[in-house]
Amino acid sequence: VMTEALKLVRKKLLNVIAELAKFADANKNLPTLAFTHFQPAQPTTVGKRATLWMQEFMMDLEDLDYVLSTMKLLGSKGTTGTQASFLELFDGDQETIDKIDPMIAEKMGFKACYPVSGQTYSRKVDTRVLNILAGIAASAHKFSNDIRLLQHLKEVEEPFEKSQIGSSAMAYKRNPMRSERIASLSRFVMVDALNPAITSATQWFERTLDDSANKRLSVPEGFLAIDGILDLCLNVVDGLVVYPKVIEKRLRSELPFMATENIMMDAVKAGGDRQELHEKIRELSMVAARNVKAEGKENNLLELIAADPAFNMSLEDLEKTMDPAKYTGRASVQVDAFLKNVVNPVLEANKEVLGMTAEINV
């Protein structure tokens, strides 16, 4: 049953990856402000950021495929795993007994049975399976966190129905309810993975029954939750709304600071003193930052630099350094390479399961 359930999870996971691939490709050239420590950092692109989400789901897919490929059955070995009853049944015929487990495995569509066991299969199997689900949940949670933060910034939003109510008191609100639900369920699955680990660790000898009730709760509930999580992810990715103008506005407000290295190099090439220019940029950057933070003004760093004769650069010259594409490095190229070399071959090999959609009621 767990094997069949993992196959269903795999199908939905592939569809989430496929939708993310479309989103990444469509937005691979759209520059956006990157964040480290949630502080402005060197720009990336919207599509490149999506590949980070996708890569983690791809890692989950690899782990899932490995576990699926190594799943085995318990077989039939008796009350303590010694096959003692079969010795009696087959009059000690070892060759006949050796054929039993391979026949069971073939009948059930597995490659093999576990060579040794107690009364049950090792509960470590449940641990491996729930760890796969927990890994997917962790990837989904990270994705949902980023969407929630981006929605706060008004750069990217999850789908929002025309009749959806964001807040019972504040009618104007557009709360990221789907992403919040992903986070909530994901935390449950990640914690749920502790159950089979503890059960496996606390089994006595050939078997104790304290595994049973816990397993009957933790395993099916983990699968039910991850099924809902993947439906939510599929729905969110399929309906993501990007606001390029907001993204551009925020990027341009920070870009003058990030362009200072290029500005300084251009000024040095024109005959300026590097040490002097470095100190002036430091001082002017502090003035511009103070204007933005303390007085709520626009970033006027370029105007301050243009007014300083040490740089010998006009505002028009400085504006030429403001092309965001100059600061995104190989982001778009990385997206193309990642899709071509990593994602698309997997999607092509599994194209018969693609095309799923998910409808969510909020």
Task: Tell me what each language-model feature is.
Residues V1-Q42, G109-V125, R207-S212:
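Long, non-coiled-coil amphipathic alpha-helical linker/lever segments
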Residues M2, L6, A50, S122, ...:
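Amphipathic alpha-helical coiled-coil segments and their boundaries
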Residues T3-L6, R10-L13, I17, M54, ...:
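Hydrophobic face of alpha-helices
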